[in-house]
Amino acid sequence: MKRITTLLLSVTTVTMTSLAGGLLHNTNQHIAFMRMMARGASHEIDAVYTNPAGLAFMDHDGWTLSLNIQSATQSRDALTTFALFPEADHTRLYKGKASAPVIPSLYGAYKKDRWTFSGFFGFTGGGGKCNFDSGLPVFDASIMAGIYGQTAALKQSMAQNPAVAPVLADPRVAGLLPLTADKYDINSSMRGRQYIYGLQLGATYKLLDWMSVYAGGRMNYFDGNYSGFVKVMPKPEMAATVQEIALSYPALAPTLSTLVNQNGEMANIDLDCSQTGWGVTPIIGVDLVWKGFTLAAKYEFKTNLNIENDTKTAIAEPAAFEAALADYKHGVNTPSDLPAVFYAALGYEFIPNKLRATVEYHYYDDKHAEMAHDKQKALRHGTHEVLGGVEWDINKTFTVSAGVQNTDYGLSDAYQTHTSFSCDSYSIGFGGAVNLSEKVKLNVGYFWTTYKDYDRSETDYFGTTLPGKDTYSRTNRVFGAGIDFKF
């Protein structure tokens, strides 16, 4: 069935490779970010990540350490309408579940006079784990369209051949051609895991009483695994009918064998591939302080990151499917660059040591960060983020804060795929801090993200020649707690 094979080759390649790319930004490293969002003008320990130049203005000489633990859950769903789906409204809901139950991060800084040396370890990117246990619409739609189109063409070819045309009068043959989705089962599952571990080291120097600078770097290590399978099996009634027809009409046996192989399968793909890679991100920053104002900026250079396959399983039956797994052969490298990033923040302390607020802007140059199959070129622009937050010290013991973030990814239909899709969003975070003593602070925060549904329609849905529509939706919830130490 050449058309089915061609469709599945393209579908499997697109779907599997999309798991290896995508927008992997992760800025919620410290609980202070969760509860305020805009931390780009911070002069506390979380500034190691958000505003490293600002560490020169910390209020404590000596060591400051911070340990943070977060727990995140996401849903990533696709509501798909396609003409060949057997449901009454031809619509199916495909649910994806992503989780990162424990997200740790560790901060450290040592300040002495005008110098501050700092370090950070955490998950700086990646989407955690995501499971599509009920499969994906791109698989189901493409397989259904391929099987229907191929068997419809077979019926037409038989009708034009006087030697076999009478066979079409047999109800068993007439009921089999063309094959509709109620005659076979598609069993598919996709699972992915992506984590980018970051280890950052750097130094801050106070040039003037109102100005400091930072230089450092972050070592990034990518760890991922992508596994999935697609199995197409005839229903028992169809399998029995195929056998009966083959016995009744031996001349049709070779043709029928293209529908169902000797193992009773119509298709079988199985993949288990781990990927690793690393790259170094140079980082510079500056912080200016004047009469209650703080103006800070940070720039992270683009990181070239190539990830290499360690493939344990790559089964494709029939053999024509092997090309679909070419990108996942053992030892193959795939680009997955981290984009250059620019942060700018303006903070103001309305009441000294009491009430402060910050507005902030982030830009991720995603269009120039190479992804698998040049996927970045499909973006309309890089990612823009605007943040704002306010923090109030109720007294010397208790602090409360809240903040918002709006994210615009510059998405396009060509960029989105079922396993790697993004949705523009806004986030709201809130929480507080408790000074357990002069040298120990407890932070607690919670934030949720509201995503805008993304609709895409195609007249030629993933090469099926039939129209289809997807609505992508996501949810995100994160809770965390952390503790800061000074000594």
Regions inferred by a protein language model and the residue ranges of each:
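Solvent-exposed loop segments that connect transmembrane elements
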Residues: 83-89, 133-186, 223-272, 307-331, ...
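Residues that define the transmembrane beta-barrel architecture of outer-membrane proteins
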Residues: 46, 99-104, 195-199, 276-282, ...
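Residue-level signature of outer-membrane beta-barrel architecture
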Residues: 109-112, 201, 205, 219, ...
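Repeated loop/turn-to-beta-strand initiation elements of outer-membrane beta-barrel proteins
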Residues: 114-117, 210-213, 292-295, 353-357, ...
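Outer-membrane beta-barrel "beta-signal"
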Residues: 432-434, 446, 473-487
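Detector for outer-membrane/organellar transmembrane beta-barrel domains
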Residues: 285-289, 293-308, 331-410
